[in-house]
Amino acid sequence: MVLNNYKQTRLDNGLRVVSEYVDSVYSISLGVCVLAGSNDETEEINGLAHLLEHMAFKGTSNRSALQIATDIESLGGYVNAFTSKTYTCYYTRLMSEYLEDGVDVLADVVQNNLLREEDIEREKTVVKEEIKDSEDSPSSIIHDYFIEQLFPNHPYGRPIQGTQETVGSISRQQIVEFTDKYYNPDNIVIAAAGRVKHEELVEQVQKYFSQEIGTQTEHSHHHFKPVEKRKKVYKKPIKQSHVLMGTRIFPRKDDRRFELSLLNVLLSGGLSSRLF
């Protein structure tokens, strides 16, 4: 996809603001992406980034949990968040005239999270139930096992949600330390697409996000071991078997990715594909 109206600004404190103007829509999608995910965790705190994401909507020093939702939903908008291996994103979708409201709420949940002990313990229970649901889904669990075998003894090989044991043992202090280390301006990208003027977006970001220069964020670098032939079998008393196999390939920007996309269509792209 070609970004015809793509603009980017880096503020003095390192925070990056990116936008693309799309004149065919009247809404905007706005995301605050913190470049910290499960890949930045140690084995001991696996699942912390995801748990922290859950805590974002439990209340801030300015808003209750209900107010966070109401301030967006009363405008016909939607607010949510997700965690990946390399980043955590807090996002909203709403009409373009409510850009300031969106920036205000997202800035609040990212910067002013209360992290109350009782909320943390409550969300641990929620996350543990999510993990149980994944463990009850063969199609989900084989993907976790596949990644584990593909990246053994590496953060990429660990589940984003963590495990029952690691999530249960995470302390508030560990969450605070993780936040202090990674939730810094130079480690945050604010992106918007839709009917949004870049200059206006930058203005609102400067208004609601801290302009202080925080600690320079340092990420740990983990080296991949060569791929070896490995397998894992998980037996469950169900009638249907689920099989997944694969290997690591070239980087995502390699020109051969186009050939791989074509191969994907040939093998599994429809009723006439080879593997159907």
Feature map (PLM): residue ranges:
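Short solvent-exposed loop/turn micro-motifs enriched in small/polar/acidic residues
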Residues: 1-3, 225-228
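N- or domain-start disorder-to-order transition segments that initiate the globular core
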Residues: 1-27
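Charge-rich, well-structured scaffold segments of protease-associated domains
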Residues: 5, 10, 21, 65-217, ...
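Short beta-strand or tight-loop elements
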Residues: 13-15, 227-230
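M16/MPP (pitrilysin/insulinase) zinc-metallopeptidase core fold and M16-derived inactive scaffolds
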Residues: 29-93, 270-272, 276
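A short acidic-to-branched-hydrophobic micro-motif
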Residues: 30-34, 106, 241-243
